[in-house]
A protein has these predicted regions:
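C-terminal transmembrane-helix exit sites in multi-pass transporters
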Residues: 59-60, 105-130, 254
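Glycine-/small-residue-enriched transmembrane alpha-helix faces in small-molecule transporters
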Residues: 1-42, 85, 130, 134-137, ...
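Specific transmembrane alpha-helical segments of multi-pass solute transporters/efflux pumps
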Residues: 25, 62-97, 102, 138-139, ...
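Loop-to-transmembrane-helix transition segments
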Residues: 11-19, 62-85, 129, 152-161, ...
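Hydrophobic alpha-helical transmembrane segments of multi-pass integral membrane proteins
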Residues: 11-15, 40-57, 128-131, 156, ...
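Helix-helix packing/entry segments at the starts of transmembrane helices
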Residues: 100-104, 175-191, 229-254
């Protein structure tokens, strides 16, 4: 079920399309910043740290609502895992393979919408799931021989990111009655905390190098990315809160 008027429905779809565009092209600036020495996990951490600072400065009451609402903590984890896994995966692996596995999201959306929202997947949702699975099969099946069943770290990150994204969108729908600024802050906090924790953990293992000394190139690039992601994530939480989970899933893979 869609919330609001037909105009609201169209605006929600447009907002989701903007967010989908962001997911489709964001790998490029992340790779450019990685070439300047900033690991994607640190990029994600810094981008969302800036977003959190802006949102808290503008709407400080959102902090109280997030802290007092345990269900929004799930959104924190889901949004954080989505951004950390996707941004890391597309910078270390084949972009097409990672994105295709990420966009198995309709499969997870159908399952999570049934479990958390009571939304049953109809024939159209089933066809979307089949389309997502067939697309992944085409990419993973080589020109000759058996499919590549042994997935590497980038592919696992794509899968994990897609599942987290589905949970993120379902939780946005489930928590549609919460304040929009609180939902946005939960998503931004997730990007900051989850990516930051992973960066510190993998840094201790020698996998993720620390950020380089400040330089105009990567600092300005990170700032620009932060404002882009603020708009994109606000668009996602607006659209996903107003459309059913299955509609959100199909718009996001358009």
């Amino acid at each position: 079920m869609t919330l609001g008027t037909p105009a609201t429905h169209r605006l929600a779809i447009a907002a989701l399309l903007f967010n989908a565009f962001t997911w489709g092209v964001s790998w490029w600036p992340f790779r450019q910043l990685q070439a300047l020495g900033v690991h994607p996990l640190w990029q994600t951490t810094l981008v969302f740290a800036a977003a959190v600072a802006v949102l808290v400065a503008a709407w400080p009451r959102a902090v109280v609502e997030v802290v007092r609402t345990p269900s929004l903590w799930v959104l924190v984890l889901a949004a954080g895992a989505t951004n950390a896994c996707f941004n890391w995966g597309v910078t270390i692996g084949d972009v097409v393979r990672v994105v295709l596995l990420f966009y198995l999201m309709p499969l997870w959306s159908a399952l999570l919408a049934w479990l958390l929202l009571g939304e049953r997947a109809g024939l159209a949702a089933g066809m979307r799931i089949a389309l997502a699975l067939s697309g992944a099969a085409v990419v993973l099946w080589p020109a000759q021989g058996a499919p590549e069943l042994a997935l590497g770290l980038p592919e696992w990150l794509g899968l994990a990111g897609g599942f987290s994204f589905a949970l993120n969108n379902v939780m946005l729908r489930r928590e549609a009655g919460r304040g929009e600024h609180a939902r946005a802050l939960a998503m931004f906090l997730g990007g900051l905390l989850v990516a930051g924790a992973l960066a510190l953990w993998q840094g201790r293992n020698g996998v993720v190098p620390p950020p380089p000394d400040p330089a105009w190139g990567w600092v300005l690039g990170t700032a620009a990315l932060a404002f882009w992601f603020i708009g994109s994530n606000l668009a996602l939480q607006y659209g996903a809160a107003r459309l059913d989970a299955h509609t959100t899933a199909v718009v996001m893979i358009s």
